[in-house]
From Swiss-Prot:
Superkingdom of the source species: Eukaryota
Topological domains annotated Extracellular: 1-41, 105-115, 179-210, 335-349
Gene source species: Homo sapiens
Presence of the UniProt keyword Glycoprotein in the record: yes
Name used for this protein in its record: Cholecystokinin receptor type A
SMART domains registered for this protein in UniProt: 7TM_GPCR_Srsx
InterPro entries, sorted: Cholcskin_rcpt, Cholcy_rcpt_A, CholecystokininA_recpt_N, CholecystokininA_recpt_N_sf, GPCR_Rhodpsn, GPCR_Rhodpsn_7TM
Residue intervals passing through the bilayer: 42-67, 78-104, 116-137, 158-178, 211-234, 314-334, 350-373
Keyword flag Disulfide bond: yes
Location(s), subcellular: Cell membrane
Sequence similarity: Belongs to the G-protein coupled receptor 1 family.
Molecular function GO terms recorded: cholecystokinin receptor activity; peptide hormone binding
Length: 428
């Protein structure tokens, strides 16, 4: 079986007989065929089923919430909707057509399905990757260049970018339906079976294609995401440093705001004069109000710091998971393109199956990272499905759809958020 082919892997979990040879593609037996352990198919079925169900459920919920909730149709959420569609497409067109032929040792779905699945598989991976890049650039503009980015951070612009992403992906992946075909082979029990293979006319084209995919779907997107999220983290870290210095300065100014240790003004700008006793209650009331305002400012600052630290941690998780999910499969693709014999010998069977499973995991974790970790989305989910318990009272701060420009996590994180002090409590 070779349904996932060169985009997710140009290698087969089925080992053809030694005598079978094709022009421009070498198929061979392993030197020492590895016996299939009885527990491996069961583990494969269990893991594939788990990832499949989580991916379908998660992405379907994301699509449902974002479509049914008009107030959540923000710029960022439009990109998240496109990401959910592409991830759902990746799950539906890849996992069943990889697992079933792998278990049966035969691609039973026919030539038309072979061409269709490889095409939609390639398109879904491409769209998903481009969406992740678009989200990172959109967040960079919102946080690091808020004034300049307001010109192009509109829903209409987001829709144009998404349309261009899908059209570009469908165009790039046109070689798949053209060069994907069924390749017959004889199994060890002398029965004839088929593999779905993506075979370009010659080795140079095959290697060039793998290198091209490695660049546009892994290396370049990975670098762009690292740079964008790195700059965002630096911006937020500077905000954390600024707020820490403001807090330290406020503490240092506090002792100088007293007069003979009797009276203290809340803003520390002047010394309060002694007044007649009849106004003592008014001064005490003013001091109490100032204390409450100070507590609000302190809580606001602490909440801001915690929110920014959470964002930085989430951005690190995004980059790590992207490389963790996709590096093994793209490395295997490149290895097989330039050293087919060695790659087949070491990766055939269970190793490549679990490498593929790791790449499919991205379609399951993306909804969790980008949506379910966002309080606005969780509130939108509760509003879309009223049968679920509401996490807070009606009309509470942070209503559905009120997404701030700072990021998908709910923190107010614009470039100049640390250039002035505010007594308002930040959104969560």
């Amino acid at each position: 079986m070779d349904v996932v082919d060169s985009l997710l892997v140009n290698g087969s979990n089925i080992t053809p007989p030694c005598e079978l040879g094709l022009e421009n593609e070498t198929l061979f037996c392993l030197d020492q065929p590895r016996p299939s352990k009885e527990w491996q198919p069961a583990v494969q079925i269990l893991l594939y089923s788990l990832i499949f169900l989580l991916s379908v459920l998660g992405n379907t919920l994301v699509i449902t919430v974002l479509i049914r909730n008009k107030r959540m149709r923000t710029v960022t959420n439009i990109f998240l909707l496109s990401l959910a569609v592409s991830d759902l497409m990746l799950c539906l067109f890849c996992m069943p057509f990889n697992l079933i032929p792998n278990l049966l040792k035969d691609f039973i779905f026919g030539s038309a399905v072979c061409k269709t699945t490889t095409y939609f598989m390639g398109t879904s991976v491409s769209v998903s990757t481009f969406n992740l890049v678009a989200i990172s650039l959109e967040r960079y503009g919102a946080i690091c260049k808020p004034l300049q980015s307001r010109v192009w951070q509109t829903k209409s612009h987001a829709l144009k970018v998404i349309a261009a992403t899908w059209c570009l992906s469908f165009t790039i992946m046109t070689p798949y339906p053209i060069y994907s075909n069924l390749v017959p082979f004889t199994k060890n029990n002398n029965q004839t079976a088929n593999m779905c293979r993506f075979l370009l006319p010659n080795d140079v084209m095959q290697q060039s294609w793998h290198t091209f995919l490695l660049l546009i779907l892994f290396l370049i997107p990975g670098i762009v995401m690292m740079v964008a999220y790195g700059l965002i983290s630096l911006e937020l870290y500077q905000g954390i440093k600024f707020e820490a210095s403001q807090k330290k300065s406020a503490k240092e100014r506090k002792p100088s705001t007293t007069s003979s240790g009797k009276y203290e003004d809340s803003d520390g700008c002047y010394l309060q004069k002694t007044r007649p006793p009849r106004k003592l209650e008014l001064r005490q009331l003013s001091t109490g109000s100032s204390s409450r305002a100070n507590r609000i400012r302190s809580n606001s600052s602490a909440a801001n710091l915690m929110a920014k630290k959470r964002v930085i941690r989430m951005l690190i998780v995004i980059v790590v998971l992207f490389f963790l999910c996709w590096m093994p499969i793209f490395s295997a693709n490149a290895w097989r393109a330039y050293d087919t014999a060695s790659a087949e010998r070491r990766l055939s069977g269970t190793p490549i199956s679990f490498i593929l499973l790791l790449s499919y995991t991205s379609s399951c974790v993306n909804p969790i990272i980008y949506c379910f970790m966002n309080k606005r989305f969780r509130l939108g989910f509760m509003a879309t499905f009223p049968c679920c318990p509401n996490p807070g009272p009606p009309g509470a701060r942070g209503e559905v759809g009120e997404e701030e420009e700072g990021g998908t996590t709910g923190a107010s994180l614009s470039r100049f958020s640390y250039s002035h002090m505010s007594a308002s409590v930040p959104p969560q």
